[in-house]
Every structure is written in structure tokens, then in C-alpha cells.
């Protein structure tokens, strides 16, 4: 399996695109080697520009729960595109998508469509500040909420991949208003409220963490956040960009029934096109322009083609799709466990709903510090052994693995053949 054409494209891209990619994790920076440039995809298969096929375990970082080029989604996009690509005016489709989201997540009474998860979290935090009249926010170490200045402090995802505590360009004033505490630590949250009486506008959390690897909230954690925010007059923002409509038809809310005040969504609700949303209680959402004083806008928000893709994806994701996602996540985790156990490699396979991760440690990982303490130096060898045998996992030890309902017996046969080689490579890896 060679990557000659990918290497040429990567070099060419580096002349005109910073780092040769448009999102840092795609550069293979933490695993080394040549990032694969993808030509096309169908079902569970990615095909790169060198003609190599891979079983996709990234799913475009979450959106593709049905697999790639699903007929219902492709037809919806084709039909919408024939009717026009963008109008800068309201459409029936955006109403239908908002209605679908509201119907699925009970605490969400109104929704505003945007273009990315970053826009959604940025807007939700601004709205929380505008609604409460407060400025400070609490976020959790290792939780990633997009590249919003105020939310980049000690974030997961790409920042974790590259070992960055924050980003240059984030001002001291912005950082001062962001209080970072340890995930799954209610005592730390309570202490932050006690130290900042009447100043905290919101707590923003991934409903289940997926950007330090898959780390589910400990029993009672989300419930505790709900209690503390109510006690202190702050809002609770549940970031479900990753978990929303993937871990269940109602997202993580469908698992623990803990009601946030505001929610952010993306990925699955986009059908693979640029679309996201934030929503919540009607009285809070009523503070948004044009009804209220908190400004938010977007030229392409509610784009008719993206809305059509998202609506088709949600409607095609029936009960059997969610059941299959669960089976596929478990099957993937079992294959990792069997292979790594056979090689005597310390590891822990973890799930956050149907998000999957492997940590090279014998301990359960419950927060970012524990994720970083794992033997992450084993991951590059593990990754490349899979990639060279036709399996495409996330190119970072700190990202969740995303299965799709398109994975079938043939796909799992390929994974099963590759996994023992990956386990051997992980076992043979040498700490730098």
C-alpha cells in the first residue's frame, strides 16, 4: 500500500494551505507519516488518491452514522441543489429541521441554525452571558468546544493532539473569564462557584466527553452540574455537537435525561455538510436578535442544501440504525481488547455511548490528566499498522473512534485481520 499521490498532494497543499490541511489533526502530526488524501467514499469505504481502500472508523469525525453517500441523503442533496444553492432568505426546510431537533430533545424549545459547531458554542456562550448579565464561564480540562477564543483553554481534540495548553492570539482578558476545572470533579465545580459568587454565566460541558478520547460522565456528574448551576443562577450548556443524534435519537439527553438550559448540535444533524445549531429554553432563546438584544447572524445559516442533507440523515436514522451503531461499537471494542490482551499490552477500551476509544493504560480514564498519563507513545505504531492493512482510525490518541451503521461482516473481517498486527506493533513500540 503506497501513498505516492497523497504525498505529492500534501507537498502541493503545503505551498498554499498552512500545514497542508484545513484542520490540524488531518496532518498526521502526532502519528507521523503522510496524510491520506481521499478521492471518494461509499458505505464504510474510503478510497484515497492512490486507489487504496480503507474501512472508515472516523466517519468524518462523527457525521456519517449511515455511512458515506447514503442514497437518501444523496437524493435529498441533489433535489435541493437543483432548486438553488443559497437564497439568503428563510425556507421551509430550515423550519422542518428545527422542528425535528425540537421533537427529539425535550429541553430544546427553540433552535437557531448556524454553520459549524464552533459557531454554535460561541453563540451559546454569548447568549448565556447576555441572558444572565454575567461574564465568567466554567469549562472542563480536555473538553473541546470548537476554536472559540474563550473555550480554547486546556482543550482537548487538536490542542491535545499537539500538546498545546491554549492558543496564541487568545488574550489575557478572555482567558481570565474562563475558569477551567477537572472533568468529572463536582467538588472543583462547587469550589469555582464559591470563589466567584454571582459572576458565572454558565457551565459548558460535553454531555459525554469525546475529545480526550471517549470519557463518559461518572454517575451523578451531569446531574450534579444541573444542581449546582440552578443553585448559583448560572446556565448549563450541554455541548452535543459530537453526541447529538449519534449516541441515541435524542443524543446524550436520551441516555441520562439531564436537562440543560442550552444545547449545541452539529455533525450528525448536518448529514456531512456544514451545518450546526444551538437551542434551548424559549425564554433564553428569546434574547436572540431579532426578538432580543443578543446579536447572532450568518449569511449561509440554514443553507437549503445542508438543511436537506441533515434532515434526510436524521429521518433515515431509525431504531435499527441506532441498534446497529451499538453493536458495531461493541464489536470494534471487543476486537481491540482481544488483540491487545493477547499481546500483553496494558489497555483500557472505553465507550461514551457509541463513541469508542482505546487508552494504553490499565486504569479507567475519567479525566484529561488520566488520558494524558496513558502510554500515548504506543498509539502511532498501533495506528499505522491498522492503516497499512486497510483500516482508517483517527490519527490521534485523543480522539474518539466513530462507527457507522454501514459497517458489515466484510468490514469487521478486515478489522479483525488487521487488529492483531496493530497490537503487536503497539507492544513493540519504544518510549521516546
UniProtKB/Swiss-Prot annotation:
Enzyme Commission (EC) number:
5.4.3.8
| Signal peptide residue numbers | none
Gene Ontology MF terms: glutamate-1-semialdehyde 2,1-aminomutase activity; pyridoxal phosphate binding; transaminase activity
List the pathway annotation.
Porphyrin-containing compound metabolism; protoporphyrin-IX biosynthesis; 5-aminolevulinate from L-glutamyl-tRNA(Glu): step 2/2
Required co-factors: pyridoxal 5'-phosphate
Which InterPro entries does the entry mention? 4pyrrol_synth_GluAld_NH2Trfase, Aminotrans_3, Aminotrans_3_PPA_site, PyrdxlP-dep_Trfase, PyrdxlP-dep_Trfase_major, PyrdxlP-dep_Trfase_small
The molecule here is called Glutamate-1-semialdehyde 2,1-aminomutase
Classification lineage = Bacteria, Bacillati, Actinomycetota, Actinomycetes, Mycobacteriales
By which gene is this protein encoded?
Answer: hemL
Amino acid at each position: 500500500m503506497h501513498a505516492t499521490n497523497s504525498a505529492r498532494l500534501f507537498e502541493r497543499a503545503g505551498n498554499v494551505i498552512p500545514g497542508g490541511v484545513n484542520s490540524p489533526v488531518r496532518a498526521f502530526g502526532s502519528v507521523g507519516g503522510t496524510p491520506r488524501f481521499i478521492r471518494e467514499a461509499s458505505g464504510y469505504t474510503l478510497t484515497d488518491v492512490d486507489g487504496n481502500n480503507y474501512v472508515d472508523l472516523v466517519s468524518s469525525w462523527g457525521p456519517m452514522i449511515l455511512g458515506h453517500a447514503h442514497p437518501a441523503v444523496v437524493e435529498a442533496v441533489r433535489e435541493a441543489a437543483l432548486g438553488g444553492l443559497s437564497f439568503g432568505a428563510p425556507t421551509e426546510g430550515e423550519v422542518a429541521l428545527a422542528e425535528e431537533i425540537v421533537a427529539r430533545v425535550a429541553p430544546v424549545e427553540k433552535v437557531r441554525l448556524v454553520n459549524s459547531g464552533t459557531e454554535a458554542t460561541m453563540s451559546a456562550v454569548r447568549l448565556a452571558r447576555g441572558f444572565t448579565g454575567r461574564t465568567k464561564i466554567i469549562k472542563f480540562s480536555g473538553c473541546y468546544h470548537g476554536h472559540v477564543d474563550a473555550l480554547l483553554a486546556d482543550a482537548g481534540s487538536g490542542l491535545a493532539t499537539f500538546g498545546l495548553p491554549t492558543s496564541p492570539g487568545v488574550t489575557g482578558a478572555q482567558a481570565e473569564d474562563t475558569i477551567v476545572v477537572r472533568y468529572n470533579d463536582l467538588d472543583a465545580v462547587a469550589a469555582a462557584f464559591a470563589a466567584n459568587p454571582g459572576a458565572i454565566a454558565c457551565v459548558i460541558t460535553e454531555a459525554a466527553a469525546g475529545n480526550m478520547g471517549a470519557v463518559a460522565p461518572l454517575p451523578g456528574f451531569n446531574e450534579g452540574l444541573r444542581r449546582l448551576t440552578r443553585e448559583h443562577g448560572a446556565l448549563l450548556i450541554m455541548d452535543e455537537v459530537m453526541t447529538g443524534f449519534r449516541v441515541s435519537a435524542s443524543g446524550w439527553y436520551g441516555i441520562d435525561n439531564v436537562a440543560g438550559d442550552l444545547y449545541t448540535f452539529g455533525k450528525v444533524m448536518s448529514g456531512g455538510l456544514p451545518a450546526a445549531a444551538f437551542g434551548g429554553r424559549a425564554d433564553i432563546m428569546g434574547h436572540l436578535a431579532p426578538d432580543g438584544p443578543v446579536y447572532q447572524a450568518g449569511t449561509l445559516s440554514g443553507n437549503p442544501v445542508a438543511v436537506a442533507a441533515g434532515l434526510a440523515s436524521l429521518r433515515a436514522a431509525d431504531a435499527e440504525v441506532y441498534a446497529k451503531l451499538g453493536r458495531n461499537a461493541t464489536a470494534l471494542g471487543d476486537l481491540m481488547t482481544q488483540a491487545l490482551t493477547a499481546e500483553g499490552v496494558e489497555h483500557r477500551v472505553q465507550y461514551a455511548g457509541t463513541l469508542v476509544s482505546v487508552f494504553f493504560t490499565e486504569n479507567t480514564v475519567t479525566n484529561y490528566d488520566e488520558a494524558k498519563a496513558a502510554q500515548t507513545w504506543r498509539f502511532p505504531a498501533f495506528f499505522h499498522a491498522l492503516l497499512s492493512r486497510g483500516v482508517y482510525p483517527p490519527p490521534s490518541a485523543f480522539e474518539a473512534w466513530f462507527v457507522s451503521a454501514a459497517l458489515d461482516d466484510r468490514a469487521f473481517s478486515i478489522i479483525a485481520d488487521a487488529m492483531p498486527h496493530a497490537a503487536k506493533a503497539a507492544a513493540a513500540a519504544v518510549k521516546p
